[in-house]
Structure formats: structure tokens, C-alpha cells
Swiss-Prot record:
Signal peptide: none
Pfam families: CxxCxxCC
Protein name: UPF0260 protein Mlg_1382
Family stated for the protein in its record: Belongs to the UPF0260 family.
Entry superkingdom: Bacteria
Matches recorded under HAMAP family: UPF0260
Organism classification: Bacteria, Pseudomonadati, Pseudomonadota, Gammaproteobacteria, Chromatiales
Length: 155
């Protein structure tokens, strides 16, 4: 099969993809939209079950994607270099998988042809997170810290 016949992600380097191709790589899992922190003791990056206020927790897509940085100035802009170096990206992330020389997973919407496949495969955060604007968010974050550092809890 020639490059023109193969899917773009199988032959184009991340840097050579068009904006539309780059955006199509997003599987819609919502994991990169979770509030995370780095554990000072271990260096591990821990994702909380609390999502950015702009994430639609049902569709797992940003509700204001084109202008998201106006509302969330520190929203991370993923780049090919970031895909190679940011180890906090989930191992399932298409950008990370391609940067590491792995192909897309069978459940990825570009492979399956079905945008719901990421949810059916249990990869997305659908049904497992709350918005940062939800009153339960602070408690969720506190519970993560409590599990990591049981002796340092404020009761």
C-alpha cells in the first residue's frame, strides 16, 4: 500500500500533519482535561476525578475548544514535542502512541469508524468524573490526597 492509500497516521510524522489531521487524532477520552498533580514524594503524576470546567463529562469533549484558552489560560497546548516528552499523557493517548512509534488502538475512532468506541472500550472518563464546578469536586481532590498521604489529612 502506498502512502496515499494508507491512513495518514500510519505514514505522516506528527510534525507534517495538517491541523485537521492533528485534531482528528484526539480520541475524545477526556483524560488530558482532568486536574492532575505531581506527587512530591514519588514524582508520579496523579490524575484526579475532577475535570476542567469546559469538559462536557458526557461527550468527553471541550465545550469551548477553539477559544478555550480565553477561559482556561493554562490549558495545555499539545504539540508533537509535547507528545514525545510529556509522560503525564495517558499511554492510550493517540498522540503519545504515535510519538512512541506505536499505532492507534483498535478502539480509536479513526480505526473503528465509531466515535463511541472510545467510551465502549472504557478508555474515556465518561461517567467517572465530576466538573470542577461541581460542589463535589473539592471532596474528590481531598480524597485523592488522603489516599496518597494518609497521615497528613485535615479532618
Amino acid at each position: 500500500m502506498t502512502g496515499a492509500e494508507r491512513p495518514f497516521w500510519e505514514h505522516l510524522p506528527l510534525e507534517e500533519m495538517s491541523q485537521a489531521q492533528w485534531e482528528a487524532l484526539c480520541d475524545g477520552c477526556g483524560r488530558c482535561c482532568l486536574h492532575s498533580f505531581e506527587d512530591e514524594d514519588t514524582g508520579a503524576v496523579i490524575a484526579t476525578p475532577v475535570a476542567c470546567k469546559l469538559l462536557d463529562t458526557q461527550s468527553c469533549r471541550c465545550t469551548r475548544y477553539p477559544d478555550r484558552r480565553q477561559f482556561v489560560p493554562d490549558c495545555t497546548q499539545l504539540t508533537p514535542e509535547g507528545a514525545r516528552s510529556w509522560k503525564w499523557l495517558p499511554e492510550t493517548c493517540a498522540y503519545r502512541r504515535l510519538a512512541e512509534g506505536r499505532g492507534l488502538a483498535d478502539w480509536h475512532p479513526l480505526v473503528s469508524g465509531d466515535p463511541e468506541s472510545v467510551h465502549r472500550a472504557g478508555i474515556s472518563v465518561r461517567g467517572r468524573v465530576v466538573s470542577e464546578q461541581d460542589p463535589r469536586a473539592a471532596r474528590q481532590i481531598h480524597q485523592v490526597f488522603a489516599r496518597l498521604h494518609p497521615g497528613n489529612n485535615d479532618k
